[in-house]
Amino acid sequence: MAKKSKIAKEQKRQELVNKYYELRKELKAKGDYEALRKLPRDSSPTRLTRRCKVTGRPRGVLRKFEMSRIAFREHAHKGQIPGVKKSSW
């Protein structure tokens, strides 16, 4: 489980990205890079990290399920993810 402070920090970044999305889009279209530079750093979407919705783990996250590989494996074995089954050939 990730530290709660890290998860909270990531949520705060997501809120800032959502807040400044339209303004950032307009400034980019105008080419006003000076004004873009004055916006908060955390309002840039490139600073976001995908995190596991179950554990908060930042690495090894499967995009489709928004879960880390470890949590995905556990839930898949229990049959808690619809449409996922262990393959064999």
Curated annotation (Swiss-Prot):
GO terms for cellular component: cytoplasm; small ribosomal subunit. Gene3D superfamilies: 30s Ribosomal Protein S14, Chain N (4.10.830.10). Keywords: Ribonucleoprotein, Ribosomal protein, RNA-binding, rRNA-binding. GO terms for biological process: translation. It comes from the Bacteria. The keyword Ribosomal protein applies. PROSITE patterns: RIBOSOMAL_S14. Pfam families: Ribosomal_S14 (PF00253). GO terms for molecular function: rRNA binding; structural constituent of ribosome. Transmembrane segments: none annotated. Part of the 30S ribosomal subunit. Contacts proteins S3 and S10. Belongs to the universal ribosomal protein uS14 family. HAMAP family: Ribosomal_uS14_1. Binds 16S rRNA, required for the assembly of 30S particles and may also be responsible for determining the conformation of the 16S rRNA at the A site. This is Small ribosomal subunit protein uS14A. It comes from Staphylococcus epidermidis (strain ATCC 35984 / DSM 28319 / BCRC 17069 / CCUG 31568 / BM 3577 / RP62A).
